[in-house]
Amino acid sequence: MDLQELIEMINDARERLLKNGIFSDDKIIIDGFSASSKFANRFTLLHPEVVKLAIGGGISGCLTLPIREINGEKLFYPVGIGDLPEITDEKIKEFLDVKQFYYMGMNDTNDPFAIDEVRKGPIYSDIISESEATQLYKFLGADMLGSRWTKTQEFYRKLGCNVEFGSYEGEGHRPHAASSKVISLLEQNLPYKKDKVI
């Protein structure tokens, strides 16, 4: 999908709503689960100027790190942003300011970045390349619910990201566990209260 076309679609929808007397926020709320959670995170990183709130669940224990390198080693997308010059320092600052919530079920076994213990590479090489997997395992870890999930949170918090994380015990790969939290965030960030535009 061309992200610029998506932004144009959003703007077109906003204009059509306005013509019908329906006011909308200047920024969007983007929410995704599993593969679409990665889209929500990456879209927010690439276009933070249009996002008010980003929500993602079942994120495979990791997010794209909004940094270019670690200890002098360039981070390649989607592990980091070392090869994405379009993500400027200003965009990184905007991204860190966007309200975000990411969550995992602690019984989730759906790991698209799982490692093949025999050859020490990714099982699903059509999802992540060998070089990307090498960096992912090196800096975040191969264990989805262990080091990878923990280190991702540590990186985002250390960078000062406006983020919350949720870990739900006894839950697998499904969004239900976080529904109350997600609904609360939506209510807090929708552009109206009690049927009145604000």
Please name every model-derived segment.
Residues 28, 100, 163-164:
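Hydrophobic anchor at the start of a short beta-strand
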Residues 42-53:
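Conserved hydrolase catalytic core segment
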Residues 133-134, 143-198:
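C-terminal catalytic histidine-bearing segment of alpha/beta-hydrolase fold enzymes
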Residues 1-21:
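Alpha/beta-hydrolase active-site loop
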Residues 53, 60-159:
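The feature captures the conserved acid-bearing segment of alpha/beta-hydrolase catalytic domains
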Residues 22-23, 35, 47, 92-97:
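Extracellular/periplasmic catalytic domains that process cell-envelope and extracellular macromolecules
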